[in-house]
Structures are given as structure tokens and as C-alpha cells.
């Protein structure tokens, strides 16, 4: 399996293919900071404190943190529908393990990376006369039994095979300020397993230059 120009090693494949519950369990506190959910006000305090560190490097190199103890009721009533603000800045929700992965707002560089990749993809498809075969469906969240997740960008064929659900993309893009192998594994694990095989490719982009934000 290829990701970001490298081959996912055997240990990573074991994580992706592990039959255990959930998909965020490998993001331990030693990998990504964890905060317990203790209500809306405390979440905002934790979010603002993390955001202050994130925006004042080198205090914090991470762009993500995990919120623990987020059951489905808490998720549905607080995080699922908001369109703006801290409560909308989650990128993955693990129903089984009650874990919510929150990401700092996308930087300009981050957005440019997504748009640039989209253009490169279209240019690569044009000689094959497939430039209009794919439609970009953006970064909206996709929900399944495992939880929910939103990519940085996603594509699917304009004409789907008979019986193929429109609920899932065929190709997803994940952009990271820094590549964390455990995060990459959780991304791939969700897309390949939750979609029931409808997602065929997970592409990751990582650039140290993005740290300039």
C-alpha cells in the first residue's frame, strides 16, 4: 500500500487491518495530546489553550488533539452539526472508542496544497481523456458504523457502477503539517473499512514547509 510516496510498513498494515474496534485507538497520549470531555465550557478552555500553543511555535508542533469520553449523545448534540467555531473543527469521530479528533483551523498553505493537488490530478488525467470522469466532492464528513470523518478533499466517478453507493468517495486526500505514522494509519483504516471498500485510494500530502503557516 502506497501513501505519500512511501510504502506503509508491515507494522502499519497490521494496525490498519487489526480486527479490533474503532480506528483512533492507536493515537495514544504519547502520539497526540488527550483531553477528557467535561462539558462545553471546559472543551472551549482546552481548545483555546491548545490553539494558543499551536499558534506560538515551537511550543506545540501538533495540529491535532484527542477528546476522550465523547459518546454518541454528546457528539450528536454538540459536534455533529455546527458549521463554524471550535465545535466544528473535528475531523474524525470514533463511535466505538468514544474518541474525537480535533484539528486546528486549516492554514492558507494547507488550502493551497489541496487546490494544487486537485489541479495536478486533473492535468494527469487529461492525456487519458479522463479529466471529466471524476467529480470533486470536497471535504464534507462521511459517516458509517465506525463513526465519521472528513477528508481534505475527495473525488468519485461521475458515472458510478450499478449498485455503487454515492455515500462514499473513491479517492480521498489527507494533508498534514507533519506526517505522523499513527495518524496516517487511522486515516487509512477508517476510509478503507468504514466505506466497505468503496474508497479505493487514500493519498496523503506532508510538507515541512507548511510549518511556516
Model-based region annotation:
Residues 1-213:
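Gly/Pro/Ser/Thr-rich low-complexity, intrinsically disordered segments predominantly at protein N-termini
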